Curated annotation (Swiss-Prot):
It comes from Dictyostelium discoideum. The lineage of its organism: Eukaryota, Amoebozoa, Evosea, Eumycetozoa, Dictyostelia. GO terms for biological process: calcium-dependent cell-cell adhesion via plasma membrane cell adhesion molecules. Its main location: membrane. It is found in: Cell membrane. Keywords: Calcium, Cell adhesion, Cell membrane, Membrane. This is Putative calcium-dependent cell adhesion molecule 2.
Amino acid sequence: MSTLGDKESIIFKEKSFGGEKWSLQNGSRYGNQAGALRSLKVGKFCKVNIWDKNGTMQTFLGGEYPDITDKLPNVDIVQAIDVQFKYSVDIRFKHNVQGRDPNDFKLTVIPYQLNGVEIVSGGDYSGVQIPELNPPDSEIVCQISIREIKWPGQVFANGSIYFKYTPSNNTVSYRKTEGWPTNCEIVQDDVSGFTITLKSI
C-alpha cells in the first residue's frame, strides 16, 4: 500500500492486482461496460461502492482485496468517496446552446450545509458526496447554479433539487420542485448517475 495515496483507490482487471488498472480519486467514478474488474486497493481515507450488473452493491473500506468476484462477478459501476460520506450523487453536465463550445459553462451543486462541487460542461461524472442522514432515506436539498466560464461569468440558471438514497436497493433518486430552473433538464442514467443539461440561455 506504500504507493497508494490515502485518498486514492486502484481497481484492477485481474485478480491479485494484475492486468490493466485504473486510479480513482475520491469523488470520481468508473463505469465498467465489460464487467471485468477482479480486485482493488482502497486508500486509508477512501470508501469504494461497487454495483454489480444484477443490482448487488458492496462497500469496501481501506485495504487490499485480491478477489472480489465471489460477491461481484459482473461489476457495473465503481464509486470512490471520502470515508466519512455515505454515498455520492454522480453528476455530469452538458448543454445544448447553439454556437457555444462544449466546455463553456460551469455547474455548481451545493448540498445543504456541505461544500459545493463545480462541474464543467462536456466532462465526465463528478461526485457530490453526501453523509449518512437520519433517517438514512431522508432527502437532501441541493442548490444549483450555472454560469458561463468566460468573463463576465453571467449566471444563466439558479434553483434547487432534492436527492435521496434508498438503503433497501442502494440507489439514488431525485425530486424536482418549483425551484428547478425551467431552462434545464435532468435525466437519471443509472443507480447513482445523473445528467443535467442546460437547454437554453
